Amino acid sequence: MVKPSLKIRKKVKKNVVEGVAHIHASFNNTIVTISDRQGNALSWATSGGVGFKGSRKSTPFAAQVAAEHAGRAALEYGVKNLEVRVKGPGPGRDSAVRALNATGFKITSITDVTPIPHNGCRPPKKRRI
C-alpha cells in the first residue's frame, strides 16, 4: 500500500508591532527573550549561546552581543516598539537595554521585575576572596 505524501506547510511569520523584551541577568549569564504581548516567544539569545564561555559570559559586552542577536531576529517579525522587563542583579542589565535601543527599537518602558523575597530562603554565604 502506498503511503499518502505529507504536505509541507510553510511557517507563516506573524506581524507583531509591539513586543516585550525580557532580560534575565544573573551573575553567570544573561538571557534575552523577545516575546509578543501575550508572552509567546519570538526570539531569544544568551551570552553563552552567542559564543562566550566561562567567565566571559558574565560580562556586559556578552550581554550586549546577546541582545543585538535577539533584536535582529525579532526585527524579522516586524517588532518596532519594545517594553523592557529586567530581572536579576547581573552585570549585563544596562548594556543589554542599550544594545536593544541601538538596534533600532523604540523602547516604551523599562521595568525592574527582580523578585524580592519577604524573608524567604536563606541567601548564599558571603564570598571570601
UniProtKB/Swiss-Prot annotation:
Signal peptide start-end: none
GO molecular function: rRNA binding; structural constituent of ribosome
Any one GO BP annotation for this protein: translation
Pfam families to which the protein is assigned, alphabetical: Ribosomal_S11
A Gene Ontology term for the protein's cellular component: ribosome
Keywords, sorted A to Z: Ribonucleoprotein, Ribosomal protein, RNA-binding, rRNA-binding
Subunit structure: Part of the 30S ribosomal subunit. Interacts with proteins S7 and S18. Binds to IF-3.
NCBIfam families assigned to the protein according to its UniProt record, in alphabetical order: PRK05309.1 (NF003698), uS11_bact (TIGR03632)
Family listed: Belongs to the universal ribosomal protein uS11 family.
Function as written in the Swiss-Prot or TrEMBL entry: Located on the platform of the 30S subunit, it bridges several disparate RNA helices of the 16S rRNA. Forms part of the Shine-Dalgarno cleft in the 70S ribosome.
Name of the protein in its database record: Small ribosomal subunit protein uS11
Organism listed in the record: Nitrosomonas europaea (strain ATCC 19718 / CIP 103999 / KCTC 2705 / NBRC 14298)
